[in-house]
Amino acid sequence: MAGTAYPKRAIKQNRRTTRAKIGKPVKLARMGEIDYTFLFIVILLLSFGLVMLLSASAPAGNTLHNNSYYFFNKQFLCAILGLIGMWVISRIDYNKYKNTVPKFMIVCTILLVCVLIPGLGVKLNGSRRWLNTPFLQLQPSEFMKPVIAMYFARLVDSGKYNLKHLKGNLPYIGVMLIVVGLMLMETHLSGAIVIAGIGVSVMIAGGTPIKPVLIGALILLPIGLIGVRALSGVRWARVTSFMNPFADIRDESYQVVQGLYAIGSGGIFGLGLGQSVQKYSYLPEPYNDFIFAIICEELGLIGAAVVILLFAALIIRAIRIAMNAPDTYGSLVAVGIAAQLAIQTILNIAVATSSVPNTGVALPFFSYGGTAIITLLCEMGVLLNISRHSVKD
């Protein structure tokens, strides 16, 4: 009827339906609704992580900076910035910056190179992983984690390379060798493992057969061990001390053994929040890679189980977002982020419990790190945005 006014929202929905009918048929995407269950778990883990960081870092903050809240305040500020980033990114269609991903990849690679340049890169605890800025120390490897997922997802979505054949995998392998090689030059083994895991996960989800990947891993494992022994005496000492951590409790095994003491003393119910003994100069940097040991000490087996269940719920929800994504690109980006969460969580807990050699992997949401928490929350924003576009059955 002439003169009839249609709501703008209805017009936009009709346009989306019309576009969906052009070309390949797709399911109708619902817009505007994020996965609130996923968001709730993220907020819960972030809050839990900040509380545990405050408890674990208070003695070190008081000793090193005469302020028990020193590490907490910095982490809290970065968490606020991360939440703002998460909210903004959750409202930007993830396809809008799809074509910018190659530029992100170039920038992140340049930053990894800059870390290796004396005067630009900062060396701490024997590793050169950070760049100094007026506000905080940036860790470029944290930026590379989501970018490698988006870059590989874009490559798969382009359809240029058939991942079912070896030739189609070569461009991905080449990119990964460059990135992982730069990170190994920084002596950042843990970051290299995580990024390689993210890349391989996206490749497998994109069509790479699993069997060749497993064969390649079995071939590379002994080569990697030989390389570690030849190039890094410190890291080889970590491997050998893993075999029998109590044989050398004053040197390479010291942190692992103190972490095991913390886990064992927690029992089932823990010593109580804030009541850890090991964080008082016994366990080095308890607010970093070994914060899970403090969780076990203060909250016991029950508290540790709650943390593990929360991470499991988050990862399962992220996989669900990947399965319901409306396109290949969104699905593979979600797979990459879910893989990062899973790899880091499993490795961190495995290191804390001396199930694998000490690699220095941070526990998401819990371990101290400004760049890490900001980047992680922005990644959660990407997943929330993908969930806005999830398809209806």
Language model features: what each stretch is:
Residues 57, 263, 267, 353:
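Short, small-residue-rich loop/turn micro-motifs
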Residues 134-144, 185-187, 267-272, 361-375:
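Glycine/serine-rich anion-binding loops at beta->alpha junctions
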Residues 188-193, 271-276, 286-288, 305, ...:
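Transmembrane helix boundary and interhelical junction motifs in multipass membrane proteins
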Residues 241, 245-288, 292, 302-303:
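TM-adjacent membrane-interface loops and short helices in multi-pass inner/ER membrane proteins
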Residues 55-58, 276, 367:
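Short linear Ser/Thr-Pro motifs
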Residues 29-42:
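N-terminal membrane topogenic signal
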Residues 41-47, 52-55, 62-255, 293-354, ...:
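Hydrophobic alpha-helical transmembrane segments of multi-pass inner membrane proteins, especially
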Residues 1-30, 346-393:
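A juxtamembrane structural motif centered on a specific transmembrane helix
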